[in-house]
Amino acid sequence: MATCFVRAAASAGFVVGLSVWGACSGGAAGPNGSGGAGPTGGAGNAGGTGGHAAAGAAASGSAGAQVIGGAPGSGGGQSTAGASGSGGAGGAGGSPAGFWDASNIPAAKNVMMFKFLNRTNGQFSDADLFWSFKSGSISETHSFAEQPIYDMPANSSGRMYFYVCAPAAPVSCTGDPTKSKFYDFIEHTIGATQYNGNTTRVDAFGLKIAMRLHCADGYEATVGEDDATFAESRDATFAKFVAEVPAEFKALAQPPYAPYRIVEPGAGAFKAGGAQAAYYDTFVDQLWSANGITIAKPGPNGSGLAAYPDLSAAIFRHVGNVAGSFTPDGKLMNKNLWKDPATFYAEAPANYYARFWHAHGLGGKAYGFPYDDVGSYSTYISHANPQYLLVAVGW
């Protein structure tokens, strides 16, 4: 069994969840023969700051036209940090009319309401889509048709799973929808008056996911796959990944992982013993040498840096390999290192899996690796007095 490195991440003064690092971030093969990361293998609710507001929402950060590493289709409204305890707000652009349907949401009796939106472009009915949530004594699994909303209580380090389970190929499953090979999830920690959560691509892509948080003070934040990704077919998304990433990463979206998942590099050839296990070695040597870093170098796919989130992010984003970026003990020295995302992923070696999800994420944000929250570029959002969360699930 691979060794897992776990860190607690804090926001607004309390722990919001766990982020799993290294070889375990990809998890073992999925329990349903999915050829990819299984539900128990990934990151929890890693902290960070950021998020971006929906169009027309009151914004506490200024919108900008920042580009993540110049990747095709990237850009969008990255924002400056928002108010304390909240995700930064920026421009999310306009989704198709009716995409974010917030009608018929009753007031919550617990903390907040969740509403589930079928955005599979007619591929599946609400009876074919399922959500599942388990926490303590809670165990709920329902189709979107049966229960399109859920009154969410306070809970810590929670995951809500989404499944496609239709009576015919290619996603046929019988009896238990949670045995479907086509699934994905969101993560959250919800306090009595606080929402903290994110979409994630740390483990893999399984289904298109986006979510919009609405709070009592009018704050809104929207994160996840962008409108163009939701509009295209599943085959097109897989083909686009293969077309846009370098040769070393193409197999992540091909069999045996496809058609079920696009897996993170550590679940593919970048793991220990894999054909790309030494992919980052030359850059790591440069980064360590330029900064006189004395801590141990990471293992394959950057594993072993649980206590050094900035170093981890630097390796995956291909930055920081100049003197003055880090202290000898591996701590960030150049506080401006994360200010310009156009410098990220600019040349190899870099985590082009993560870059792809940033390029096709709302506002250029994604959770493409465990410490993608460094610099507020992840899909993590946090705000007080949440009223509802809209979750869009696509195919």
Predicted features by range, described:
Residues 96-395:
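Extracellular low-complexity, O-glycosylation-prone Ser/Thr/Pro/Gly-rich "stalks"
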Residues 1-22:
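Sec-dependent bacterial lipoprotein signal peptides
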Residues 16-96:
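Ser/Thr-rich, Pro/Gly/Ala-heavy low-complexity intrinsically disordered linkers and tails
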Residues 2, 22-24, 82, 171, ...:
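Secreted/extracellular small peptides and ectodomain modules produced from precursors
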